[in-house]
Design a protein with these regions (language model features):
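Terminal beta-strand-rich extracellular "head" domains
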Residues: 64, 71-81, 90-171, 175-221
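Short amphipathic
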Residues: 57-68
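Short, solvent-exposed loop/turn segments enriched in Ser/Thr/Gly
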Residues: 83-85
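Generic recognition of flexible, low-complexity loop/linker segments
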Residues: 13, 36, 88-90, 203
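Extracellular repetitive beta-rich solenoid segments
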Residues: 1-57, 96
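Well-ordered beta-strand positions in beta-sheet-rich domains
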Residues: 12-14, 25, 88, 159, ...
Length: 221
């Protein structure tokens, strides 16, 4: 039998149950709940008010590098890796279930070289390409500039985003390392072009010096 609730002037709301064997009791909670809440069941007929849980941004950190840095090539193989100045943040997670959205933007320049970048948590690479082919450099991201002379005046903005789940409440550091993956080439520059970053820099207006950043957002699970 359906239960019909008539409106004060017109219309009604009718509650009905399917034709099924057995009896079921639903117990309503005390009170009217709060704005935006919904009724949930405990699986045994008990109803209660609950709030929708979604991820929220708990904290935001940022590292900014406005200077100039270079990475030398190796004699016949990739040069050494090194931290990019100021592109690091040290934090303590609010919860072990927190996730972290890391966004890195690097302004780089050079010609006849291959800049490679590595996203790290403490001393561990947390995102690397795995499709090795011969002597391929496996990095988080990077690019290659040909020997075209025009590239010595250019800068590119390289950007990547990644969500990390460190599962800890201990202090951690997110950072970016750089490397010149081209052997016997010329230097890779952060925040300037090759023409503007070399020992005898070209001071003309067409050489743009930029900025690089790392931003980390802690998101509740």
């Amino acid at each position: 039998m359906a239960l019909r609730l008539n409106g004060s002037s017109s219309g009604y709301v009718e509650l009905d149950v399917p034709a099924a064997a057995g009896s079921h009791t639903l117990t309503l909670p005390d009170g009217g709940g709060s704005s935006g809440q919904y009724l949930q069941t405990d699986g045994s007929g008990g109803l209660s008010w609950a709030s929708v849980t979604t991820g929220k941004i708990l904290n935001v950190w940022q590292g900014v590098f406005t200077g100039i840095q270079s990475f030398a090539p190796g004699p016949s193989a990739p040069g050494p890796r090194a931290d990019i100045t100021n592109l690091s943040v040290t934090l303590t997670p609010t919860s072990a279930s927190s996730r972290f959205l890391i966004t890195c933007s690097i302004s780089m320049g050079g010609a006849s070289n291959s800049p490679a970048y590595y996203l790290m948590r403490d001393s561990t690479d947390i995102l690397l390409n795995t499709s090795s082919l011969g002597a391929t450099t496996l990095a988080t991201w990077g690019s290659h500039h040909s020997g075209n002379t025009g590239y010595i005046y250019s800068t590119d903005l390289q950007t990547i985003s990644y969500v990390d789940s460190p599962a800890t409440t201990s202090s951690i550091t997110y950072k970016v390392q750089g490397q010149n993956a081209f052997g016997a080439g010329v230097a890779v520059f952060v925040n300037t072009s090759q023409a503007n970053g070399r020992a005898a820099p070209d001071p003309n207006y067409y050489n743009v010096r930029g900025c690089s950043t790392i931003t980390v957002m802690e998101i509740s699970s």
